[in-house]
């Protein structure tokens, strides 16, 4: 895991109110202005006041981000305070770097450290409250050290041609992001779900404005200068769930919980959960028909064409079979060259509201190429995710 955000409602105490901007203060319902009381009746009002923590601590101390929201309920005549705590990188928080990965067994240490760091910045909360706090954001992640014969850039190039449906980024948006980072980062988004892929080591060597990981610790700088990472490429895979409803939808079955039950900080440290989530999210990309076409491994356009012809001929020699072979090749070649989203978007500009027909055609097209493997890089990532080996600093010394 990497980023985690969770909420505490009233079960905390702030001892250093001046650390917040504006300065933190508590009010009763009777102290609210007339306008605030009116706002408290509106269900669209998320909060009345927001306090952001700006602690005066040593920059070497990796602290959580904290925001407090003041919310009023006109029906009960009460004012509540909800604290949102975000740890932007659990490995950095616990290990001072995120080359390494945390373990399931680190749960108690991380919860204790959270209580300790919060106390340092003027917030008193119990370990039990942290453990049972509902989670609102969680980023699952995996570092995969690539063998020398696999180029990370080729993997990112393949993934940039994939698509996850109409709600996701267009391929054009993905290419803009890739160009901004010299082709070193690929994002796929779906509302509050997001996939992110990049080179972990190269990212840390970039200027802050171009990095995915904006906060570089002093220890990470030392590691970069003292360890020989020069010949290593590390594929960073992050699957980000950015809303509590999305988290419940993804995790309630894996945790044997009902959808209505909250997912807590302690729940996230369940054995096997991280692998299950990341493997499932990866397969969601690979199993879509348009992505199967995008990720095909073929030496040349002619090889792909001849393979499709032979497969179609084996089915039957009718004119229908020939037509199927021709449009299958056209779809496959266009998607490999320009990306699934671009092809689908351009088709939809001409044949409006024909999504179901196109989806059906894409599914049929995969039947003629289902015996062509995915690219070597994609296959390598799939294999490494299934193995899900723990990564620490010794892993970088030995490689794979």
What role is predicted for each listed range?
Residues 343-353:
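Helix-turn-helix DNA-binding segment
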Residues 1-338, 342, 362-400:
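Structured, helix-rich domain cores that form ligand/interaction pockets
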Residues 354-358:
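Residues in the recognition helix of alpha-helical DNA-binding motifs
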């Amino acid at each position: 895991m990497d980023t985690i955000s969770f909420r505490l409602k009233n079960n905390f105490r702030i001892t250093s109110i001046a650390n917040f901007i504006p300065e933190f203060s508590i009010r009763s319902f009777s102290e609210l202005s007339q306008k605030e009381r009116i706002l408290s009746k509106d269900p669209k009002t998320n909060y009345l006041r927001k306090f952001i923590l700006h602690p005066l601590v040593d920059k070497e101390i990796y602290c959580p981000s904290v925001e407090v929201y003041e919310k009023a309920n006109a029906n009960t005549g009460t004012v509540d305070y909800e604290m949102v705590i975000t740890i932007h990188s659990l490995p950095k928080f616990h290990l001072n770097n995120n080359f390494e990965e945390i373990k399931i067994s680190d749960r108690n240490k991380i919860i204790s450290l959270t209580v300790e760091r919060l106390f340092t910045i003027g917030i008193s909360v119990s370990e039990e409250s942290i453990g049972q706090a509902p989670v609102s954001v969680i980023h699952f992640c995996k570092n995969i050290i690539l063998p020398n014969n696999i180029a990370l850039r080729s993997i990112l190039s393949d993934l940039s041609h994939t698509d996850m449906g109409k709600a996701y980024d267009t391929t054009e948006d993905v290419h803009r992001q890739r160009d901004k980072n010299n082709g070193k980062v690929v994002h796929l988004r779906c509302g509050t779900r997001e996939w992110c892929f990049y080179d972990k080591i190269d990212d840390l060597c970039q200027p802050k404005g171009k990095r995915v990981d904006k906060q570089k610790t002093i220890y990470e700088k030392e590691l970069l200068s003292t360890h020989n990472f020069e010949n290593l490429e590390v594929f960073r895979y992050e699957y980000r769930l950015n809303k509590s409803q999305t988290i419940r939808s993804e995790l309630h079955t894996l945790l044997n919980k009902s959808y209505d039950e909250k997912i807590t900080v302690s729940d996230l440290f369940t054995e096997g959960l991280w692998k299950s989530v990341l493997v499932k999210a990866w397969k969601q990309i690979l199993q879509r028909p348009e992505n199967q076409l995008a990720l095909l491994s073929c030496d040349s356009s002619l090889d792909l064409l001849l393979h499709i012809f032979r497969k179609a001929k084996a089915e039957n020699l009718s004119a229908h079979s020939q037509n199927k072979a021709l449009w299958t090749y056209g779809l496959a070649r266009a998607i490999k060259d320009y990306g699934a989203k671009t092809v689908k978007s351009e088709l939809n500009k001409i044949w409006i509201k024909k999504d179901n027909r196109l989806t059906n055609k894409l599914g049929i097209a995969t039947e003629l190429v289902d015996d062509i493997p995915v690219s070597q890089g994609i296959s390598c990532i799939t294999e490494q995710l299934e193995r899900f080996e723990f990564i620490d600093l010794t892993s970088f010394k030995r490689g794979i």
